[in-house]
């Protein structure tokens, strides 16, 4: 607890937060499962880009992602992050500058990570990826109980465990994950995506649909229903990493960056959302180092997979770009941050880690 208190003070000083918060009216959250901080801040890894023993095309990587410097490579991989978000928002987790963003839970895999993100509680009893209904209240559930938010909270995820992580039935929120169809009155694009998800190759054996479907299904829902709190849970990066396909892992990251750009452009152009919406982007866990193939894995056997990153942009966020000051913050601080940016205090019957304070007056 002493370490956490010091960490919170460091983060607050790093980001020069003011004493009074400018709140947002809406929040959009995007997670990219298992995307390493090394790629976010350095682009294609030099050790993996030339590994001819891998299950991927080094020629494709060279043609599409390679550049001589880290700065150029990260911009080729994540152009929205580095051309727009870094200029107008904040990015935490650049370990080369001693800025650390980490799991507080000790497991470093998906269910515990998502539980920590949304409940603010790094519960050691949450220790598997099994389809067990989460007993911990999450911030989406909390917000759905607040005046003006009821029925205006939605989550779309590729992985079919989000229904359990977010405990959709108890929470009373829409959670569309796995291969669930979107229900209700649908436009032609929504009908098409419902059909396509059952006709496209099932690359991940029934547990997860492709992110292109998840994003577009969620995006169409967002445009049609204007939720005040919207979550997109993307998963291709983790699946391709586990398969050892570094080229497709990079491709999935760049496609995610393009979708986030599309999402942000929409948010900034739609009167309901424009200048009233904050976007938060992060990951559930990191991965091992490139050497010895550890990048394919995560968990307690690869302790470096606790190393994460987080980004935010919007009217509540003080622009700081890539934070280059040393400090430590935890994934579990995101839940309280989401609530605080909306002018709420996330209180429940379990511990909630304190909010990050990177807002502007």
Model-predicted regions and their roles:
Residues 28-29, 37, 257-296, 338:
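Metal-dependent active-site segment of extracytoplasmic phospho-/sulfohydrolases and closely related
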Residues 1-23:
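Bacterial Sec-dependent N-terminal signal peptides
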Residues 104-229, 233-242:
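His/Asp/Glu-rich, glycine-adjacent segments
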Residues 20-90:
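Active-site-proximal N-terminal segment of extracellular/periplasmic enzymes that hydrolyze or transfer
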Residues 141, 146-147, 325-358:
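Non-catalytic, well-ordered alpha-helical segments in soluble enzyme domains
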Residues 51, 282-313:
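Histidine-centered active-site microenvironments of extracellular/periplasmic hydrolases
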